[in-house]
Amino acid sequence: MLRRLLERPCTLALLVGSQLAVMMYLSLGGFRSLSALFGRDQGPTFDYSHPRDVYSNLSHLPGAPGGPPAPQGLPYCPERSPLLVGPVSVSFSPVPSLAEIVERNPRVEPGGRYRPAGCEPRSRTAIIVPHRAREHHLRLLLYHLHPFLQRQQLAYGIYVIHQAGNGTFNRAKLLNVGVREALRDEEWDCLFLHDVDLLPENDHNLYVCDPRGPRHVAVAMNKFGYSLPYPQYFGGVSALTPDQYLKMNGFPNEYWGWGGEDDDIATRVRLAGMKISRPPTSVGHYKMVKHRGDKGNEENPHRFDLLVRTQNSWTQDGMNSLTYQLLARELGPLYTNITADIGTDPRGPRAPSGPRYPPGSSQAFRQEMLQRRPPARPGPPPTANHTALRGSH
């Protein structure tokens, strides 16, 4: 009965009307009052009016650029890196060249890999960035993110997942491709799913996962008045362990175009028996690069119809139904480029094609990934944001 109710046109109209009402409220400046209503933890106080240069303190990193690999048996890196500076400046102009970014990051290895030289990192984090036709945004992100992560003393790698062709953009499916390909390379502790146009403003926002559940990291974007737009928002930048990602069957593959997938993902977290955690609002600051609407990423007219079916579709639509054709894998000086044909919207003239990953069921794929996980390392586990992942929300 409930299912029939959700599929009625009047119900969809109500959902559309509700979203329009919320958007109107937020556009009139309601973000801060909404944040207060939901009691978001503001966290420690930072002075964002006097940010430091994003390349500050890199001269204090141990080890010479391009030096030999770090010896075995090093002590763990401190939970809170002494190199952190807090708020960092974010500039969108001029856009740096790739050569300039390479020159300023001599410790970054091919494929966008980095590992601290003087201590054992507490987390191995893969940054996965869906991408198409945003070259300026990508260069800004790489210029900003590499020094940001090095100061946190993490082992990390950056993966840029490029959607081939001119079909409708599918952010969530590209993230599934990125997770699949990143886990072929290494047993990452943490998967950071990162929009290309968001730059972090505070290096106390640690790029590590919360073992208790998925983290939504971009809690305070300038686009939304540096407040969380609504409690279940999960867009922009999020972090999950591989086990958490597989437990919710990854992200949906059927959201072609803009909108809807973030709410679907938040629902998956709940249906998989997990809760979203967040850093304090004062820590999770991000600036969005200004841009016009993307051709091929128009508003998804089917998003509400898909959302009302999430409760029944999430176990069938995700990593266990992922299809794509890997066209290229290139180790660039700043990132690993993955180019994939993910097909087109099945409501269009051609359905997705390519090899199926995995060849078996979702249980078989999950078992494969779990078997690839290494035994627990001795010593303290990776630590989440030192300002405390304050409770679940």
Curated annotation (Swiss-Prot):
Official protein name in the record: Beta-1,4-galactosyltransferase 3
Glycan attachment positions: 57, 166, 337, 385
Enzyme's top EC category: transferase
UniProt-listed GO biological process terms: carbohydrate metabolic process; galactosylceramide biosynthetic process; protein glycosylation
UniProt organism field: Pongo abelii
Lumenal side, ranges: 32-393
Gene3D superfamilies linked to this entry: Spore Coat Polysaccharide Biosynthesis Protein SpsA, Chain A (3.90.550.10)
Lineage: Eukaryota, Metazoa, Chordata, Craniata, Vertebrata
Names of the cofactor(s): Mn(2+)
Bilayer topology term: Single-pass type II membrane protein
Chain positions recorded as Mn(2+) binding sites: 197, 291
Cytoplasmic topological domain residue ranges: 1-10
Ranges where the record places region Disordered: 339-393
CC per GO annotation: cytosol; Golgi cisterna membrane; Golgi membrane
Main function: Responsible for the synthesis of complex-type N-linked oligosaccharides in many glycoproteins as well as the carbohydrate moieties of glycolipids.
